[in-house]
């Protein structure tokens, strides 16, 4: 084999190995293309009480015949009305889920004193907190826990 042929074979091998490695890297990086969280859905039982509760807490809501949507920034929680989640024809849900089945953590941008005052104004009893908890931002925050009228757990986390 000539020197030129050897070099060509070497370069071909290196290019092939590089392409394979690059392809594997791209595959590994592209394996999870999830870029954010849009919404979640949970069943609700006490529609009027739930709507009043989330409004008292200052959330923006929309309603339709199937759900009440509570907006948190660019995400939302869809609370399915009983007529929706109890309908056997509605299968796009967790079949065993019944109220209360939610455990939601909201990021609070104010102080602990402001949170406590807001909850008191809304007539909401604090179940626990503030206590330190690990959060989704991969650091510790201060959490305060309450329950909504259906019994779902709401956590308000404050990051320093």
Segments the model singles out, each with a brief description of its role:
Residues 24-35, 57-110, 116-147, 160:
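Vicinal oxygen chelate
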């Amino acid at each position: 084999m000539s020197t030129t042929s050897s070099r060509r074979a070497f370069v071909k091998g290196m290019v092939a190995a590089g392409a394979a490695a690059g392809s594997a890297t791209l595959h590994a990086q592209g394996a999870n293309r999830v870029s954010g969280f849009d919404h979640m859905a949970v069943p609700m039982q006490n529609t009027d009480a739930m709507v009043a509760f989330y409004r008292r807490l200052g959330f923006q809501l929309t309603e339709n015949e199937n759900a009440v949507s509570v907006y948190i920034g660019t995400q939302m929680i869809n609370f399915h009305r009983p007529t929706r989640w109890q309908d056997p024809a509605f299968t796009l849900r967790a079949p065993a889920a019944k109220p209360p089945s939610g455990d939601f953590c909201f990021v609070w941008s104010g102080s602990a004193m402001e949170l406590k005052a807001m909850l008191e104004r809304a007539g909401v009893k604090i179940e626990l907190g503030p206590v330190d908890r690990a959060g989704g931002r991969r650091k510790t925050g201060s959490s305060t826990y309450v329950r909504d009228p259906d019994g779902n757990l709401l956590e308000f986390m404050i990051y320093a």
